[in-house]
Regions:
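Ligand-binding pockets and gating/stacking loops
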Residues: 2-498
């Protein structure tokens, strides 16, 4: 926190010294009737009367999009852990006759596999035990595990040819979200906030919500850097909303502090920050001021956003929020995502854990699909009914796929699957994506891409293109180099664009 004691006396102007004399620590905390513990800067938020002028414009760095934008916002349904494409979207009926046989060397082609299966004596082929059917006018193949998703196949583009360089969770997730396997780069949502700015001055441009699935309860952790801003200004990092009645930490007034007092506190801190900016020229001070003011406004906007009492029973039922067996956290988050989209939030990230199914996959994936199938489909249907799907891009998928061979013992009704980055499936809907298609093909074993490969950088380049952004031109100069989400690669996949 900036205090008057940070400023050398020989560097302050008369005006600054006058203000500093007024704002001694005793005077500041005495007037606000709060001790350090109850009035920490993390809690310098408030709402009574009108908010002060916004410290930052909220505009993005781009004066306008490079292309006509088809999408204005993104809802990213991230399935953490790596869903099995072979049990959900990549139908391989020919594998039934190969059950238990060794994965051919001609298919593996010497590719590395994780240490969890590299020591197995055999790599037995494990065909899915679940049935697939074709759905909609598109005739897209979808597993019986996803009956609700099957009902929206004419609205989604299923991509079966994604591939990634990483085979472990953290680097793969970091790569998908930031364009680099190494931590420290800005996330996709942060790039969009930086480039396009926010559309609502009372809510962040980038919001994150996390839920735990009923599948693998010991799934990999989700680190906050996955929605971080890296080296771009911190005002562009995501804001996590927790479940429950208090979604944002320190948003409510602490005991003994009303909105008027909070407003005065914030004004004084703003003055101190202005002095610091004048003295040191640190651009992050503007970010700090903007974040305090945004938090102040959120005291009213967030309770209104998260109040579902005005939603109809039909809407609540459509998402399955109160249904037994449907994860209320994810279902509720999907409905909140629609409400955020209505209010202009630029990037909405839902992260649902539990897909890391190395063993006991058939049992775990049933529950996991029940968690997300109905709410995901309901979100697409709800957006479409309200006229929002046209300019809202919805994305569903994880950081990689799963192997065709079984991890551990293969039995009649049980198997596990290891990590597999050579090919996996995701889908997108709305926002100018091409509906009712299946894009890309894999070989007969679902092990390698054989047509229309979509590396992660291409996927992200395509997302940016739908938002009207040339991925090669949204850059940030850091340590003498112009960085971008797609690094030095990336090719827009026109086949995914309507």
């Amino acid at each position: 926190m900036f205090t008057p004691h940070n400023i050398p006396s020989n560097e302050t102007s008369p005006t600054s010294r006058s203000l500093i004399e007024q704002l001694t620590r005793r005077h500041f905390f005495g007037r606000t009737a709060a001790g350090i513990g109850t009035a920490a800067l993390a809690a310098l938020l408030g709402r009574e009367g009108l908010a002060a002028p916004i410290a930052a414009s909220g505009k993005g760095i781009l004066e306008g999009t490079h292309f006509p934008a088809k999408a204005k916002r993104v809802i990213y349904l991230f399935m953490s852990g790596g869903p099995s494409q072979l049990d959900l979207f990549d139908h391989k009926p020919g594998l039934a006759d190969k059950r238990g046989t060794e994965l051919p060397a001609s298919i593996r082609m010497g590719q590395r596999i994780t240490g969890m299966t590299s020591g197995q004596k055999t790599l037995p082929v494990a065909p899915s035990i679940f049935n697939f059917k074709q759905h909609g006018q598109s005739g897209s193949w979808v597993s019986d595990l996803l009956p609700h998703t099957a009902s929206i196949t004419d609205d989604i583009a299923i991509c079966r040819s994604l591939n990634t360089e990483a085979i472990n969770h953290d680097p793969a997730t970091t790569f998908l979200q930031t364009g680099s396997q190494q931590p420290g780069r800005p996330s996709l949502g942060a790039w969009l906030s930086y480039g396009l700015g926010r559309a609502n001055d009372n809510l962040p441009a980038f919001i994150v919500m996390i839920s735990q699935g009923s599948g693998n309860k010991t799934d990999q952790p989700i680190f906050s850097r996955l929605w971080g801003s890296g080296f771009i200004p911190t005002e562009h990092q995501g804001v996590r909303f927790r479940s429950g009645d208090d979604p944002v930490l320190y948003l409510s007034n602490p005991p003994g502090i009303d909105g008027a007092v909070r407003r005065r506190m914030l004004d004084k801190v703003g003055q101190l920050n202005e002095i610091a900016k004048e003295s040191f020229g640190d651009p992050e001070i503007d970010t700090r001021i903007a974040q305090y003011e945004m938090a102040y406004r959120m005291q009213t906007s967030v309770p209104d956003l998260t109040d579902l009492s005005k939603e109809t029973k039909e809407t609540i039922d459509m998402y399955g929020i109160n249904d037994s067996g449907v994860d209320g956290g994810f279902a509720r988050n999907c409905l909140l995502a629609r409400r955020m989209a209505e209010r202009g939030v630029r990037f909405i990230q839902l992260m649902h854990r539990g897909w890391d199914q190395h063993g006991g996959l058939p049992g775990q994936i049933r529950g996991q699909c029940k968690d997300v199938d109905q709410p995901s489909a309901a979100l697409v249907k709800d957006l479409k009914a309200r006229g929002l799907l046209e300019d809202t891009l919805v994305i569903w998928g994880g950081e990689f796929g799963r192997t065709v061979y079984s991890q551990g013992a293969l039995t009649e009704n049980n198997y596990g699957r290891d990590h597999h980055g050579r090919c996996y499936s995701m889908w997108m809907a709305g926002g100018g994506s091409k509906p009712g298609i299946t894009f890309g093909e894999t070989d007969d074993f679902g092990y390698n891409v054989v047509k229309d490969s979509v590396p992660v950088h291409d996927w992200n380049a395509t997302i940016l293109r739908l938002l009207g952004i040339d991925h090669t031109k949204l850059t940030f100069r850091f340590q003498g180099r112009d960085f971008r989400l797609t690094d030095v690669e990336g090719e827009v996949k026109q086949g995914l664009i309507a």
